[in-house]
Amino acid sequence: MQTAMKLYGLFGIACLSAALTISSCAKSERRTSGWDVKFEDWPLTDCSTSTRPVRDLVAYKVLGVPYKWEEDWLSGTTYIIKPDFNGTKSSFSYKDYLEKNLCSGTHGAYENLIESKTDMIIASRDISRNELKSANDVGIKIITKPVAIDALVFIVNPKNPVRNLSSDQVRKIYTGEITNWKEVGGVDHTITPYIRDTDSGSQEKMETLVMAGLTMIDGTYMPEIIGSQMASPYLQIEMDEYGIGYTPFFYCTAMVRDLIKVNMLSIDSVVPSKESLKNNTYPFVSSIYAAIRETESQESIAHKLFQFIFTKSGADMIDESGYIAIKD
């Protein structure tokens, strides 16, 4: 196993640094997967907020639609992938595309798949126990498979001098055992630990991947610490020099980038990076998943798309999005 990248007293990592290779090749050449797929035959898809770029990039590449990364003017907090015809006329309708390709968030995407409102999803996590129960209750079996590597990272305000926490310190902050930054080498000030809403992919990963059964702080009586959107931790940390939050690595490095300046902390002295995610030296590595109903016809475009993303061509597209494809 490769030696982990270490961080000892160096400045924190802004999300911008890991995004440079993505922004440097903003537009793709027109290319398809070899399929003869018309847009009107394209399946209904859904996704998490953080997996939207990979879902969209695969769709554009298969359909032969050129694309570019650009700031999402609606949110103002992320970059997204959009069609790029560079002023030329095209029959492709972005409005029609958005109607067939939803972005309902992790829990919403699984709900739509269970309720047959969509045909295939790419989500930031595996199906949860509650979602699995909902599927079982209506006699639906969901097939899920990890498609790419991600991680849960911890972010702080750039003015916060803390640059590294141990896994144990993170857990103690979120159980309420550690309450002051001076206990972890910072200034003498109370820590504000921000959390996410219950059904979010980030919260589920925090509880299972990081806390591993430990009881987290309860936001019931502190609603101000609960973030309801993917951008919430960033907006909270931007305004709070003494806060800490968590977010997917890809969302931070590929989507937020420089729009909101935060520092990613190293954990156990390992910097979150593509290298440390690939070699699994960063402690909180996770996966994103593709999911489909078991009853989906093998002749359907949805089923063929599900199979395609696990091929070499599919993996190349996932890598192009900035994610790290899981390759057999």
Task: Tell where the protein language model's regions lie, with residue ranges.
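Exported/periplasmic ABC-transporter solute-binding proteins
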Residues: 25-328
